[in-house]
Amino acid sequence: MRALLKKDFDTLTKHYKMYVILLVFFLFAGSVSTTDEFFSTFPMVICSWFTANLIAYDEKQEGSSASGRKLYVQSKYLFQFITVAFSMIVCVSGLSSRYGVGSADFCNVLLMMLAAAFLVPAVMLPIIFKNSAEKSTLKYLAVLIIGVAMCYYFSAAFEARYIAHISLGLVIAAGLLMLALYFLSYRLSVKYYEKREI
């Protein structure tokens, strides 16, 4: 597992430097921005780009299943989780200084970040592992666009109606539910990938 993760990080920094630079830019912008929620949530979407592009790179190199298919899927989900966790730590530190931990605005943006971090890849990765990254490009982009649009739409609707009642406990409960869906997505991806002909 460690070797697979190291390979992914090496591939990312060697072949996808622009994505890394883009992530750093948005992490910095998200940590200092005083109003725009987009800069706080978009880094989570970029992390999904990382994972999808790494899978596509592996498929071109014909080395995606060299270490066993289940272990390979595990490494991609763990890589996604690590990059998202790092990004969230940076962005949440900015949110806490901007809004204050536990405030309604803080909880609302954090909820949107969690959705972008876990719901988008939970839908996207099984599609990729079932069909291959190349065949799933349009579906992947559709999931990203729809997912981000839904995050903003429901966030705005939620904020307008319930923001006064949102609490950190509710956000934590929602986050745990999203993690459970992320785990179910992993199980589904393993099932699809083990059955797929390569």
Give each language-model segment a name.
Residues M1-K60, Q74-I198:
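Hydrophobic alpha-helical transmembrane segments of membrane proteins
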Residues G63-R69:
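Short helix-to-coil transition segments within interhelical loops
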